[in-house]
Structure formats: C-alpha cells, structure tokens
Amino acid sequence: AAIFDLDGTLLDSMHVWSDIDVEFLRKRNILKVPKAYSQALASLSFRETAEFTIDYFSLDEQPDDIMHEWNQMAIEAYSHHVQLKPHAKEFLQFLRSKNIRLGVCTALSQKLYVPALQNHGIFDWFDAIVSTDDVNKGKSYPEPYQLTAVRLGVSPEDCVVFEDIPEAVTGA
C-alpha cells in the first residue's frame, strides 16, 4: 500500500498556510510571522497548532474559534485554488493500475481535504483517508500512520509513506 501526505506532497498547498498565517496575525496587529513559529507547526495537528499559536503569541482566544477562522480562510483556497503537484495524478493512476491500495494521512481536516481531492477528481481513488484529528496526535507520532494502515487492511510494514516533513517521516 502507499500512504500519501497531502500538503506539500500531493497538493501544491504550502503557500496557503503561510498566506493564512500572515492574514491571521495581521488581523491581530502582528505584522511579521516569526520563522521559529512557522517551523514549529510542521508536524502538529490542527488543534495542536491552534493551542501552540495561543501560547506562542499570548492570545486571549479559544482553540475552537481560531480553528474556525482558519477553516473559513482555507476552505476557499482548498476548494478552488490549490493545485496538484506536477505528475501527482499520473503517479496515482500508475499505482492504481498496479492494484496498489492508496491511503492519505494528513493534518488537514475533512472540511479541507474532501473539496481539495474532489476538485481534482481523485477523492474516490483512495481506499482510506486519515486525519490527525482522528487520533488527536500529530504526524511526528506513529498513530496516524498505523490507523491508515488498519483502514487500508494492511500491516504497517507493507506500506510505503510519501512525506515531505522530516518529523512526519520519523513518525511514519
């Protein structure tokens, strides 16, 4: 089986989150996104990111409110603007032609990954899709990948994982 990350691996979407960071922080009169902040987010779940953001910037806000705001900004981008990485669709077609089971393991919420994959006509190509929200752990931990393997009906040892973040590779 093959398990794919979405942001930065199948989807050319990393700019979406940096754009959201800039706009979100600008609304709070924080005019520069610190590099250390951006780097710390790489393998966190969506909720962990909201909690980290509150702590990092000492915001008097609730994680659910922040996640809702981010979701509204991101739904627009993922539904209409995010493109597949070059040759991603062809590679997935090739794997499907070899009867290789396909899975997704992503930090994206269902509200974002469904429209992104549907927009490119590949949502139904995946035999299993797991979000870090399903296990409440980021991708630096093995649990998201283990659940993806279970849902694919294969042992983790029989999976190849495609990731772009070193911490996530460690988790896999």
Predicted regions, residues:
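Residue preferences within the helical output face of two-component receiver
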Residues: 8, 171-172
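Substrate-recognition "cap/lid" segment bordering the active-site pocket of phosphatases
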Residues: 81, 109-160, 166-170
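Residue-level detector of family-conserved "landmark" positions at structurally sensitive sites
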Residues: 35-36, 64, 105, 127, ...
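Short, conserved structural micro-motifs that define repeat-unit consensus positions
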Residues: 96-103, 145
